Amino acid sequence: EADFKDRAAFTDPEILRSSLASVILRMKALRLNDIETFPFVDPPSGRAIADGYHLLQELGAIDPESERPDALTETGRSLAKLPVDPRLGRMILAARDQHCLTEMLIIASALSVQDPRDRPMLAREASDQAHSKFSDDASEFVSYVKLWNWYHEQVKHKESQRKLVALLRTQYLSPLRLREWHDIHSQLMSLVGEQGWRLNKTEATHEQIHLALLSGLLGNLGFKSEEAGHYLGARDIRFLIHPGSK
């Protein structure tokens, strides 16, 4: 009861909860006022604004060393045309150049939804065994591609929707989240088509895929520290690898 009474009466406005990188990017593309002076009903904190600028700099969308540090770079202008999270947009731009758009659209849409793989507390071993067919020894990101291909093979040869749903549940997969993943992928496909970009017809290599991924995940890089099991990331952040990761 005490915990309930201490909770806020209303959820914080979205502008206060989400990354401001997208907001800053759109405002600059539309040549609106700087976010610091824009008359928001609930203005974001200075820390949140600084983090948003830092992410855009990390993605190469702005260049603080240029004559106009507040202006968008060519990469920034391209990102502003993609109505997705700037990190995902940066991966997609890099995938276009690395000729791995086919795989990246699958991965980017997967990262936009909750993981479709269920791992119930009372069926950890069984679910892990079922999901092992999608695993990739070199990359968890590529596991999404394997799962995607498996799922669409089942859809292609399904006898009925009811039987497909039953099969997915025996494999500890969420039919609803798989559908959501499919829908977002379709949206990204339409977006890429509007830009006139071509999907690669030959399978991309792990190197191509990961070079594209890294362009949007620079802040997530880390190296193994001297402390057993610990890694050191950007801004001296210490982190651990999830027990379920290989």
Q: What positions do the PLM features span?
A:
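Second RecA-like catalytic domain
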Residues: 1-246
